Regions:
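Conserved, helical-rich catalytic subdomain that frames metal- and/or nucleotide-binding sites
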Residues: 151-152, 156-254, 269-282, 291-295
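Residue-level signal for inorganic ion chemistry
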Residues: 14, 42-44, 74, 112, ...
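Short, basic/glycine-rich phosphate-binding loops at helix/coil junctions
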Residues: 52-67, 140, 215-226
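DPxDG-like acidic metal-binding loop motif
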Residues: 74, 107-135, 148-150
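Short hydrophobic/aromatic beta-strand micro-patches
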Residues: 265-267
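ATP-binding N-lobe of GHMP and related small-molecule kinases
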Residues: 1-107, 125-130, 170-172, 180-183
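Phosphate-handling active-site elements
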Residues: 83-96, 122-142, 270-283
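Short glycine/threonine-rich catalytic loop with a Thr-x-Gly-x-Asp
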Residues: 106-115, 253-262
Length: 295
């Protein structure tokens, strides 16, 4: 048996702009995404020597915040990889995936996608055979955030359904505090509400933010952080707005919901101020899953 352990990092959406639903049922979007230090720890163990009735078994062992095994993106990643591995080699491999969850689920932080990408990376390192192009095709098939999580760079402009990526400069060194209320949000439900309500939304400034990233202008980056989904999600889960208000009151240069929610992130230039904001979230009159990390 061989083992590979990978840190699967969360992401935040610095901008998120949604367009009309396409004929295939998906929405076109445009988003500047950035990875952060918050991560799950994914350990993958493979066994190519088993010959008993459990040969080819895929098991997912997860600490918390996880759906049924076969609905789990990490499971689907292993299943897709192993099918291609068998097709190319004629060999059967068993796989155990152990996930130490730190990224909340249904939060807009890409936890499931990060785990999925980590499994694909680990299996490629352990078993080889699969090309980078084949791995990227599996990633795009499994989820719109997975291709970004698979990339080695930290920041990108995602367009189309989210799978077309353009590498961007990283943010200047700073700190991120996240707060996630217990009530999660279904991405599908939020897209349906977006279609139904056609919410009046902020003017998204992705081009201005990209220019600010290129110039390493921290203040202007923060001025152009915005999310079209946020008004809809605050209407559905009022705690999102309260977390955002707490982060801004604690000195965040910017605070915004990530993805389709329900996590909110705050950007801080100073570590001590970020840690103070983390503590402030703990005083809110409802449960908040919190993290503080570098960007």
């Amino acid at each position: 048996m061989e083992t590979c352990t990978i840190n699967a990092r969360a992401k935040i959406n610095l901008t998120l702009e949604i367009f009309d639903r396409r004929k295939d049922g998906y929405h076109d979007m445009r988003s500047v995404m950035h990875k952060i230090g918050l991560c799950d720890i994914v350990k993958v163990t493979v066994d190519t020597e088993r010959t008993d009735e459990n040969a080819g078994e895929i098991r997912v062992i997860c600490s918390k915040y996880v759906c049924a095994e076969k609905d789990n993106l990490a499971y689907k990643a292993a299943d897709s990889f192993m099918a291609l591995y068998y097709k190319k080699t004629g060999k059967i491999a068993s796989c155990i995936i152990e996930i130490e969850k730190n990224i909340p689920d249904k939060a807009g932080l890409g936890g499931g996608s990060a785990d999925c990408a980590a499994v694909l990376d680990a299996l490629t390192k352990l078993l080889g055979v699969i090309t980078e192009k084949e791995k990227e095709e599996i990633a795009a098939y499994l989820g719109s955030d997975v291709p970004f999580m698979l990339e080695k760079y930290d920041c990108a402009l995602a367009t189309g359904t989210g799978t077309t990526l353009q590498k961007l400069p990283m943010m200047p060194m700073c700190y991120c505090v996240t707060g996630t209320p217990d009530k999660g949000l279904s991405t599908r439900d939020i897209y349906d509400l977006f279609d139904e309500k056609k919410h009046v939304v902020p003017n998204v400034k992705a081009n201005s933010l990209i220019s600010a990233l290129e110039q390493e202008d921290f203040g202007r980056i923060c001025d152009n952080i915005v999310n079209q989904f946020e008004p809809i999600c605050i209407h559905e889960v009022s705690e999102i707005g309260k977390i955002k208000k707490c982060l801004l009151k604690s000195g965040a240069y910017a605070a915004q919901m990530s993805g389709s929610g329900s996590a909110v992130f705050g950007i801080f230039a100073d570590k001590e101020q970020a840690e103070a904001a983390y503590r402030a979230l703990g005083t809110l009159p409802f449960d908040v899953r919190r993290s503080v990390c570098k960007i």
